Amino acid sequence: MNNQKKIGTAAFAVLVGICSTVAIFADVESTGNLSVALNGAGMTQLVALAALVYLYYQQLINSNSMWHQQKLRERMGYGLVALIFTVCMIIGKEQTAHEDLKYGLFAVVMFAGYVPAFYLLVSFCGDWFYNQSLQQNAGKRPGKLTDWLFEKHVVLGVMLVVFMCRLPYLISFFPCSMSWDGGAQISNFYGREIFTNHHPPFVSFFYGSIAWYSQKWGCANLGMFLIPLTQTTLSAFAVAQVCAILKKMKSPYWMRWGILVYYAAFTVWCIFDVTVIKDSLYVPFALLFGVQIVYCLFFQEEFFAKKQNIVLLVLYAIMMTQIRNNGIFVLLFTLPFVFFVIPNKRKICMAVAVVVMLGITALLDNCIYPALGVISLEDKVDTYCILFQQTAKYAKEHPEDVTDEERAVLDALFDYDELPSNYEPHLADWVKNCLREQEGSETNPTGSHFAALKKDYHKVWFAQFLRHPLTYIDAFFECSYGYYYPEVGTYKEGLGFYVEERYMFTESMSDAKQIEQLAPARFLLEQLSKLEHVPGIGMLYRCGFYAWCVIFAFVYLIIRKKYVSMIVTIPSIVNLLVCMISPVNTCIRYAFGTMCMVPVILAVMWYQGKKE
């Protein structure tokens, strides 16, 4: 390379380095002043600029750099990931940007800075991961503890580790920690509220029967303790099965240790296991279902040789659908791909399994639960939360652009005058509270009011979308950005339920009571959640981080042409899409279905490298 080209390359590296530094340190919240938003003055920024310019320059001039060594497929794949990450960052920062800031102009600078920075980061991670996975680590003998835990006594050993990590929580929060949803489901069982299938009936019966009989038999504390004990046992078993599949895939021991520590010691998993809430039951079965899918895809002969593996797959699938309403979508989008890639001689067996899953699920939902007194909603309004939010934002920003006919339809469904002031991007409940008739109420037990107006509402929704599509797009981003933007923290009780004064106890449905003398221990455990502010570890508490992991994994597997392995990412992707239209933005428990599968996905990526 001649001097003129080197100078041009250096100038380009400096320009891109400046843009990347601006993007990394941008302050879009404090002021509308563009120069202040650049936030470029400071030694930290100078060090970052120097490092970035050096890295960019070396990538461009060094023939042995990642950029020059990568094939076109890798460049396109990593470039796509960098582009997606950049768009996520720009959308996320827009939500908190100062209203006077010319954000569109500033976003152009950030775009020019984020893309190369993310490309460099993603390329490094992808190349390192691939090169490391090619190493077989032959001849390296594990230590005695590692050998005992991950080779000789996987299930027993791993379950013991998980229980030991949960033990401080089980003791300190004895008998349990109560959530609003958990208390509401017990209230359904008690008959204090109309028992609908708004919450999964199976969980309501499970929680409610324990609360009822333990109170009736005079052992409220011991009875309620069965809930966290059951949830912890299920979690421990699920993690043990993850480690068992890691053993089959011969994952490196450092990876097994890291995954075990994540599942066993991460404070979010610990506190939710002792909390009465359906998500704590969903995670183990979602994880077990994912492990069975991995087993089926990569160890087919062994999987289909034992009928119990098919039975377990069916059981875990059914339990997923009965514990969270979105579990059915995981099945419907995952199993067709599994069916497509397995050999023809196995398809009949898998088809029968799918029919059994769906048949039992339909039987429970349409026959068993109604026979037990559960009222089936005609249409669940939570499904339409994002549409309601868009309607509310439209009413707030374009009140003059609503026709009399549209207002009449909307006013029949909502208290229209209250709709604009109740628009809250983080929480759709405020807009749902504007409904004239709440589903599950005495006057509207089946949600028939909304069902009758749904067709007319959709017409109004679509007509207003055509007039102001950007308003609808803005509303969607405002209500969902936390699930793909990793710089925003969790919303309201996102790190767990550390207090007991909830629905069930305040309504005197149970005499269960946490031990007052253990309040200091509960306080100390709550302080552990402050780890979310520690660099690196803090990312584990961000919903958007897990979305990025899944996006990276999905594209990485495309780059490596591991199309069968991509099926393992489908449950996480489905859960992520459901989160984006959910009633609450940045609610970490909604993201559990994605979070719990990320370590399994990473292990599969590593396993595919070992097979080459």
Short names for language-model regions:
Residues M1-C19, A41-L83, K102-R166, Q608-E612:
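Start-transfer (signal-anchor) and selected internal transmembrane alpha helices
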Residues S30-V47, L222-L226, D474, E478-T569:
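Membrane-interface anchor segments at the N-terminal boundary of transmembrane helices
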Residues L120, L229-K250:
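Transmembrane-helix motifs of polytopic, lipid-linked glycan transferases
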Residues G157, V242-A265, P284, F304, ...:
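Transmembrane-helix signature of polytopic, membrane-embedded enzymes
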Residues F173-Q185, I194-I210, G218-L222, G593:
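Extracytoplasmic catalytic/substrate-binding loops of multi-pass membrane glycan-assembly enzymes
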Residues I271-Y282, I323:
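Short acidic/glycine- and proline-prone juxtamembrane loop motifs at membrane-interface regions
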Residues N309-R324, L335-P336, V356-I360:
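Membrane-interface alpha helices of multi-pass inner-membrane proteins
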Residues L372-I515:
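Membrane-proximal stem/loop segments at transmembrane-domain junctions that anchor or position
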